[in-house]
Amino acid sequence: MAPSEDIPSSEQRHQKIQARILSLKKQISFSKWWTALFFLISLGAAVNFRFLPPISENVRQFLGISPSSTLISIALIVYAFSALILILGRMNTASVHFHGWSHIGYLSAFYLFYYYSGTLRDNFWAVFIAGLTILSLENYRVWSVCSETIKKEEKTLAFLDK
């Protein structure tokens, strides 16, 4: 193999960097879309999921008695603090990937638990504020890391263009 085959050309490096920049911009965009999905789910929860059929007695018997609102709230608090600690820990790793999809699943489950227990109207704001806090911090983390990396990549492009 000739030495020139091991070293990518200037144009290849340029294209690779541009592809990385595009990928980072997509990560920022994905994080916004996931947050929009949470808002849509929250809209459904705000109207007590009126568009869903009522839970039948057979399903209620199969699922059993719902946990009390207090237990669900304790679980929400534990989850929210755990999620925030994990996000803050990821801030140090400089990972550019958005991890909010799992948060949306958990937060949706809390809406459903409150819905099943019949206390969604009383606890909607607790889930919404927890979700808004968690997803906002995750969005900030992704935006911060991606923006910093994009600036570095753009500096590299400027250096290659000289």
Q: Can you name each region flagged by the protein language model?
A:
Residues 76-112:
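Loop-to-transmembrane helix junctions at the membrane interface
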Residues 35-73:
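Hydrophobic transmembrane helix segments
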Residues 38-44, 77-84, 132-139:
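Hydrophobic alpha-helical transmembrane segments of multipass integral membrane proteins
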Residues 31, 69-78, 126-133:
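Alpha-helical transmembrane segments of polytopic membrane proteins
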Residues 2-7, 80-85, 144-147:
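Membrane-water interface of transmembrane alpha-helices
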Residues 118-162:
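Terminal transmembrane helical module of multi-pass membrane proteins
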Residues 49-59, 85-91, 112-122:
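Juxtamembrane "helix-exit" motif on the non-cytosolic side of transmembrane helices
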Residues 1-31, 156-162:
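N-terminal juxtamembrane cytosolic/stromal segments of multi-pass membrane proteins
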